[in-house]
Amino acid sequence: ISGMILSGGYPELHGKELAANRTMRQSVKEAIKQGMPCIAECGGFLYLHRELEDQDGIFYPMAEVLDAKAYRTNKLGRFGYINLTANEAQLLGDKGMTIRGHEFHYWESEQCGESFHAKKPVGKRQWDCVNGNETLYAGFPHLFFWSAPEAACTFLKKCEEYGTC
């Protein structure tokens, strides 16, 4: 395996089962620690936390890539389409690169990150988000790669480089 994409999937509905699979949690943590490129969007982002609160209010251990808790809120969090601009060079490209995405979640994180700046296409709402570095994109926004195909190419190139190490 040369890279990972951890997209949605509602891990908060399967906290007990995910926590019980220690081998998988440790494998994901070690792969990312060793530099395997990883895109973790929304539910995948939640899985990378130290702990995740399930729908019944019980916290379970997750992959521990991020030293933070992810927890339930009683309201819909940031919702809808957004434009993302990279605040720094990271897995998907250089500082200033842009890509569209969307968010839809009732969960929140103690560590939302600040590798990207999100802005609603209509209105003034904006915020920093995403934990990123040369090999990791981990945040709530789901990415729309058709809006920035070069970001997908950059990710695949980094996967190829990792696979030949």
For each predicted feature, which ranges?
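Amide-donor transfer/coupling interface in amidating biosynthetic enzymes
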Residues: Y71-C165
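Short, flexible active-site loops
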Residues: G8-G15, C129-N131
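Structural motif
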Residues: I5-G8, I39, A138-F140
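Glycine-centered secondary-structure boundary/capping sites
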Residues: I5, T23-M24, E160
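Conserved acidic residues
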Residues: S2
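Cysteine-nucleophile active-site neighborhood
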Residues: P11-Q90
